[in-house]
């Protein structure tokens, strides 16, 4: 149990630091769409897609790795709470169209990245 807890802890900490770095690096690039949060969410969606496809196919892998990557790293990297707050800030500033665009890009982009990663990994491992 302690090993599983440490896997989530290490993955979550690493993902959180990665999200902070992406936010610091990319959020200043655009005033309406927080690109760091978007980048973190899209990368996390892709990683979780690969992870889920990998763990579905490789059932012998220690569950600790699934916890480290999906629950830990992706949980720390992706952030619905920050995304939600950024949408609220855009709405408070009266930038309704940008808020709606931010919602659409984050939601559709995350779904697309997860599906793409799952499909790519499944196709590659079938050969």
UniProtKB/Swiss-Prot annotation:
A single GO molecular function term of this UniProt record: metal ion binding
Binding site for Na(+): 75, 78
Reactions it catalyzes: fluoride(in) = fluoride(out)
Biological processes per GO annotation: cellular detoxification of fluoride
One cellular component term from this protein's GO annotations in UniProt: plasma membrane
Subcellular location: Cell inner membrane
Transmembrane segments: 4-24, 35-55, 71-91, 103-123
Activity control: Na(+) is not transported, but it plays an essential structural role and its presence is essential for fluoride channel function.
Key word Protein transport present: no
UniProt keywords, alphabetically: Cell inner membrane, Cell membrane, Ion channel, Ion transport, Membrane, Metal-binding, Sodium, Transmembrane, Transmembrane helix, Transport
Membrane topology: Multi-pass membrane protein
Entry keyword Transmembrane helix: yes
Membership in a protein family: Belongs to the fluoride channel Fluc/FEX (TC 1.A.43) family.
Functional note: Fluoride-specific ion channel. Important for reducing fluoride concentration in the cell, thus reducing its toxicity.
Protein name according to UniProt: Fluoride-specific ion channel FluC
Originating organism: Enterobacter sp. (strain 638)
Top-level taxonomy: Bacteria, Pseudomonadati, Pseudomonadota, Gammaproteobacteria, Enterobacterales
Originating gene: fluC
């Amino acid at each position: 149990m302690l090993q599983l807890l440490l896997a989530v802890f290490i993955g979550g900490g690493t993902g959180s630091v990665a999200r902070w770095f992406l936010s610091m690096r990319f959020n200043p690039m655009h005033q309406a769409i927080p690109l760091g949060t978007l980048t973190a969410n899209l990368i996390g969606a892709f990683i979780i897609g690969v992870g889920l496809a990998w763990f579905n196919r490789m059932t012998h892998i220690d569950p600790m790795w699934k916890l480290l990557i999906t629950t830990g790293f992706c949980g720390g990297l992706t952030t619905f709470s920050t995304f939600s707050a950024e949408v609220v800030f855009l709405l408070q500033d009266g930038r309704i169209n940008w808020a709606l665009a931010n919602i659409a890009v984050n939601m559709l982009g995350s779904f697309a990245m997860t599906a793409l990663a799952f499909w790519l990994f499944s196709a590659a491992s079938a050969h």
